[in-house]
Amino acid sequence: MSIRSLGYMGFAVSDVAAWRSFLTQKLGLMEAGTTDNGDLFRIDSRAWRIAVQQGEVDDLAFAGYEVADAAGLAQMADKLKQAGIAVTTGDASLARRRGVTGLITFADPFGLPLEIYYGASEVFEKPFLPGAAVSGFLTGEQGLGHFVRCVPDSDKALAFYTDVLGFQLSDVIDMKMGPDVTVPVYFLHCNERHHTLAIAAFPLPKRIHHFMLEVASLDDVGFAFDRVDADGLITSTLGRHTNDHMVSFYASTPSGVEVEYGWSARTVDRSWVVVRHDSPSMWGHKSVRDKALRATKHEQQPE
């Protein structure tokens, strides 16, 4: 009766058209129509996984976590209330917008709107047709992917996501931010995906550092790298992470939030033990962020 996966994310952005082009033509997502939930995008048999709404924050607006059924939803609502968290039951209008049977809404300790739901819409009768050459995305029991939450107090956030929401610690990377500055990054799982959430006290203005999509082949990563690189949006070169062993690159979205696009992450099972890493990558992942930021700012200049 616990959270099974990250089911969907919604972004509030100042340039919806730029996001539409980026998600479909660069990353290979499928357009799934425009509703009062925003512009919707698919990566699998679900009716939608990412929503993009008009807004000025240029950031993650909400995230939805999936439970198995109504009993699981009620259990999570009770657990949140017992922890002193304000919980609202989503009305029929919100459930229709999200395409789910039932949901609750609340916020994490630092104000990120979160939802827990069950009964998401499946559209097997409408085959997934990628917007660019992608053989497929890895979802299923592992869910949509992950995001890295930026918070001022990682201990407080970690306690909330583990003690209240039930995530489990996979490992920790001590990120060296400068000669005398190290920030621990906590990687959490709720299924066999190595991490569905990471938490770090990064001094960034956004709610998240990046979100991640995992694809089916190394060629999917390579072709997407070339498409994104053609517009100068790469923020980190190809590399392989020390903790989940994913081969990936990072790129800037039109809002400045980054996306990680990767392949072949290892999974956690009952034999998994928590470890600590001193470096985020075995090789690669060299920063070229300044170049990408210049390209993003150029795109945002009025014509």
UniProtKB/Swiss-Prot annotation:
One annotated GO biological process: xenobiotic catabolic process
Basic and acidic residues compositional bias, start-end: 287-303
Annotated PROSITE patterns: EXTRADIOL_DIOXYGENAS, VOC
Binding site for Fe cation: 146, 210, 260
NCBIfam families for the chain: 23dbph12diox (TIGR03213)
Family statement: Belongs to the extradiol ring-cleavage dioxygenase family.
Name of the protein in question: Biphenyl-2,3-diol 1,2-dioxygenase
Gene: bphC
